[in-house]
Amino acid sequence: MFDANCLKLMFVAGSQDFYHIKGGKNDRINALLDTLELALQSQITAFQFRQKGDLALQDPVEIKQLALKCQKLCQKYGTPFIINDEVRLALELKADGVHVGQEDMAIEEVIALCKKHQFIGLSVNTLEQALKARHLDAVAYFGVGPIFPTPSKKDKQVVGVELLKKIRDSGVKKPLIAIGGITTHNASKLREYGGIAVISAITQARDKALAIEKLLNNA
């Protein structure tokens, strides 16, 4: 079951987001698992498993193994576990949710496969995309961004806080979660529009627990 409160602070990450860690693939995997457990203890409200980018795992077996470990941690703390893009994996692992973008599997197909099993999040980068999908009851929330410049979405045009305002003012009733370049310094600008999703604000933080506390207080 979907509860919009889980959008307050969503941590999004994969092993590739620990590129700053010395060592190889296994060191990045361990860094993800350690950071996820700390984040769960610090009361993030959801975790989204996302393997994308140059250093992302490529072997489906390794991806599944890591996803399972992340899922077990989320279950231990009673926190929703969401899989980004990998619809089949979300179904196989019985993830709580699945999040897809505009370039991933067609949203109608995702709904047909997942609506009885997972809640569904959809990324929107324009007002038109939000208006087009507003009638899809099976879509639980919209992920809106990138709000600020971000290295994880280099090819996407920054949409700014203005897009959140336009979507809300257009009468779209779905919960919104902002993503892209969100930090402890700018998160407060987004409070009135819904939740926030972050990657580097947690993975790159020296004091991760403190960063999460600040993000939760701002969200």
From Swiss-Prot:
Enzyme class: transferase
PANTHER family: THIAMINE-PHOSPHATE PYROPHOSPHORYLASE, THIAMINE-PHOSPHATE SYNTHASE
Protein name: Thiamine-phosphate synthase
Amino-acid positions noted as binding 2-[(2R,5Z)-2-carboxy-4-methylthiazol-5(2H)-ylidene]ethyl phosphate in the UniProt annotation, renumbered to this chain: 150-152, 181, 199-200
Pfam families associated with the record: TMP-TENI
Transmembrane spans: none
Keyword Transferase attached: yes
Residues engaged in binding Mg(2+): 85, 104
Function as written in the Swiss-Prot or TrEMBL entry: Condenses 4-methyl-5-(beta-hydroxyethyl)thiazole monophosphate (THZ-P) and 2-methyl-4-amino-5-hydroxymethyl pyrimidine pyrophosphate (HMP-PP) to form thiamine monophosphate (TMP).
Binding residues annotated for 4-amino-2-methyl-5-(diphosphooxymethyl)pyrimidine, in chain numbering: 48-52, 84, 123, 153
Pathway(s) the chain acts in: Cofactor biosynthesis; thiamine diphosphate biosynthesis; thiamine phosphate from 4-amino-2-methyl-5-diphosphomethylpyrimidine and 4-methyl-5-(2-phosphoethyl)-thiazole: step 1/1
GO molecular function: magnesium ion binding; thiamine-phosphate diphosphorylase activity
Keywords tagged on the record: Magnesium, Metal-binding, Thiamine biosynthesis, Transferase
Any single GO CC term annotated in Swiss-Prot or TrEMBL for this entry: cytoplasm
Its EC number(s): 2.5.1.3
Keyword Membrane tagged: no
Cofactor: Mg(2+)
Cofactor stoichiometry and binding remark: Binds 1 Mg(2+) ion per subunit.
Disulphides: none
Catalytic activity: 2-[(2R,5Z)-2-carboxy-4-methylthiazol-5(2H)-ylidene]ethyl phosphate + 4-amino-2-methyl-5-(diphosphooxymethyl)pyrimidine + 2 H(+) = thiamine phosphate + CO2 + diphosphate; 2-(2-carboxy-4-methylthiazol-5-yl)ethyl phosphate + 4-amino-2-methyl-5-(diphosphooxymethyl)pyrimidine + 2 H(+) = thiamine phosphate + CO2 + diphosphate; 4-methyl-5-(2-phosphooxyethyl)-thiazole + 4-amino-2-methyl-5-(diphosphooxymethyl)pyrimidine + H(+) = thiamine phosphate + diphosphate
Stored CDD domains: TMP_TenI (cd00564)
Superkingdom of source: Bacteria
